[in-house]
Amino acid sequence: MSLQSIKYNRGSLEILDQLLLPVQSKYVAVRGVEDGWKVINKMQVRGAPAIAIVGCLSLAVEIYPEEFESKKSLRQEIEGKLNYLVSARPTAVNMKIAADELLSLANDLTKAEDVSVPDMKQRFLNATEAMLQKDIADNRAIGANGAQAILKRVATTLGAAGTSGNGSVRVLTHCNTGSLATAGYGTALGVIRNLHELGKLEHVYCTETRPYNQGARLTAYELVHEKFPATLVLDSMVAALLRAKNVAAVVVGADRVAANGDTANKIGTYQIAVVAKHHGVPFYVAAPLTSIDLQIPSGDHIIIEERPDREMTHVGEHRIAAPGINCWNPAFDVTPASLITGIITERGVFEPQELKEAITKLLGL
């Protein structure tokens, strides 16, 4: 059974504090938008899908007990709080897309003469809560689509590397993209989970993912919890791993995908893609449609969040870097579309060059 990172009942929200894992499993109450902003910004909750869900549900928790004099005052409250939540971690596009959708709903309900203030509030709460279940369903579809894409590629490639006699595969993933990064099941880790369910996962390798160690702390925690055949490797071992272990595919998540397929993901993703290209290993990005930003033409336009120096210089309270050294700590890098084999979504797997046209048709834009 997969881990539960988000616990929600109407009026109540708790998140599993990911800063304490794997040593301690502790749920933290999120009582409103200010709490939501803090747990996102401090990375007590992380992963682009989970950020959006926790952000929106924190607003639902805050407005649930409140009474509003007018629909206009409710709409103003919604708009201001959503804009604030988007600022918590700006690289992940899911929160911005969710905020835009909810604000659009609030605007429509404000204009509707047959909708009362209580009705508007109820419909808004329903919409935020629906995101939770939709994310789980989308993740399962991503998992199935990605697993089939990998297995199909292996089956059609003569003498494919990374496979055993029964067609099982060895895969590599980076950062954390599982139940802890989503409402449940996962994106890239959802693909791996689906391979395991099909009996086609021979082995999964996960990187430590410095400096926050999401791979060592979180992905490894999930893999051990679910008893997957798994091995942790250092970030600096990826080239040696792909050379020595015959990995069939690399699968990573995404915080934002540009219209041309350029992908912003956890720092270190770009160099893994370069190494995968050199070794002829397919490199897949697994992401829901909400992570694809067609308004951004390329990765050059993606804002990259920079984190505090302390995250590099300390482990917990212990300094590991020489005092006085300067640090550069971008949380993400951008992998060029030319290095990406396919982008796995809940609606199918697309090559980067066909992404914009395909998504535009799917969404009827």
From Swiss-Prot:
Annotated PANTHER family: METHYLTHIORIBOSE-1-PHOSPHATE ISOMERASE
Name listed for the protein in its UniProt record: Methylthioribose-1-phosphate isomerase
Function of the protein: Catalyzes the interconversion of methylthioribose-1-phosphate (MTR-1-P) into methylthioribulose-1-phosphate (MTRu-1-P).
Primary residence: cytoplasm
Family membership noted in the UniProt record: Belongs to the eIF-2B alpha/beta/delta subunits family. MtnA subfamily.
Active site as annotated: 255 (proton donor)
Site entry (Transition state stabilizer), positions: 175
